[in-house]
């Protein structure tokens, strides 16, 4: 198997296969669940809006893949600084049956100089998740832009108890980039938290070559056995089709407009 195919198979099993569109329907989410069960292995998770969790849970169970995790989003996509709302949404997501919650960090507050609200929001959302539900925190790297802010946001999230730090919502002009990924992975390394904290690039990872580049970077910074499904995810939709093409199990074309 070529190096690219090896990377493609590895990436597929690390995917949070995502649909977060305003026009999502039960039918689209059911199809997403079907797609997550691929001929060469399952994606790690699906990522959907909270209202679709019950239909997704039912579909995954009925198709014999209850182990595919269900991730959802809160405080999404704007990352407002109202802690009560973020916590209430997170509690509701857990009550719906989410296995993982991707919450948006109040990045505009950090840009304005307020570090405390982000810390408090993440800490309280993690408390709402408890030990069983993973909390991934989206810092919106493409809006923070500066290395100092990206590293500070990553540090705050980790100190407040985040299980993962995630680049982007996919709803702003600039999402995951290798440059931003490196900054965040270096924070995980430098804080000595690689055992407990994972990383998720999201938006803009569209091809097997992209995934290979991101995984090689993780291997370089945190070691070749670090990037398993507890420590690494790709947030993507169109990536799956490209990975399956690379692995020669489909000839579908990816949607060029997809996340």
Curated annotation (Swiss-Prot):
Its EC number is 4.1.2.4. GO terms for biological process: 2-deoxyribose 1-phosphate catabolic process; carbohydrate catabolic process; deoxyribonucleotide catabolic process. Catalyzes a reversible aldol reaction between acetaldehyde and D-glyceraldehyde 3-phosphate to generate 2-deoxy-D-ribose 5-phosphate. It holds the Pfam family DeoC. It is found in: Cytoplasm. Gene3D superfamilies: Aldolase class I. Pathway: Carbohydrate degradation; 2-deoxy-D-ribose 1-phosphate degradation; D-glyceraldehyde 3-phosphate and acetaldehyde from 2-deoxy-alpha-D-ribose 1-phosphate: step 2/2. Belongs to the DeoC/FbaB aldolase family. DeoC type 2 subfamily. The active site is at 102 (proton donor/acceptor), 166 (schiff-base intermediate with acetaldehyde), 200 (proton donor/acceptor). Coiled coil: none annotated. It comes from Vibrio cholerae serotype O1 (strain ATCC 39315 / El Tor Inaba N16961). Keywords: Cytoplasm, Lyase, Schiff base. GO terms for cellular component: cytoplasm. GO terms for molecular function: deoxyribose-phosphate aldolase activity. The lineage of its organism: Bacteria, Pseudomonadati, Pseudomonadota, Gammaproteobacteria, Vibrionales. This is Deoxyribose-phosphate aldolase.
């Amino acid at each position: 198997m070529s190096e690219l195919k090896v990377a493609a198979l590895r990436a597929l099993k690390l995917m949070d296969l995502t649909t977060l569109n305003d026009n999502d329907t039960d039918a689209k989410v059911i199809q997403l669940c079907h797609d997550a069960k691929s001929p060469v292995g399952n994606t790690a998770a699906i990522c959907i809006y909270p209202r679709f969790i019950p239909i997704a849970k039912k579909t995954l169970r009925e198709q014999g893949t209850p182990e595919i995790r269900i991730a959802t989003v809160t405080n999404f996509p704007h990352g407002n600084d109202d802690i009560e709302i973020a916590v209430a949404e997170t509690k509701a997501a857990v009550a719906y049956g989410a296995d993982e919650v991707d919450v948006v960090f109040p990045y505009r507050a950090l840009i304005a100089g307020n570090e405390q609200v982000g810390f408090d929001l993440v800490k309280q959302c993690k408390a709402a998740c408890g030990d069983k539900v993973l909390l991934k925190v989206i810092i919106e790297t493409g809006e923070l832009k500066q290395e100092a802010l990206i590293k500070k946001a990553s540090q705050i999230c980790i100190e407040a108890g985040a299980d993962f730090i995630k680049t982007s919502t996919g709803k702003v002009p600039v999402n995951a980039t290798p440059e931003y990924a490196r900054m965040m992975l270096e924070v995980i390394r430098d804080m000595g938290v690689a055992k407990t904290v994972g990383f998720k690039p999201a938006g803009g990872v569209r091809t097997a070559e992209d995934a290979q580049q991101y995984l090689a970077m993780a291997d370089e910074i945190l070691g070749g056995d670090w990037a398993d499904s507890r420590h690494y995810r790709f947030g993507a939709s169109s990536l799956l089709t490209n990975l399956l093409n690379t692995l020669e199990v489909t000839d579908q074309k990816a949607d060029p407009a997809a996340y």
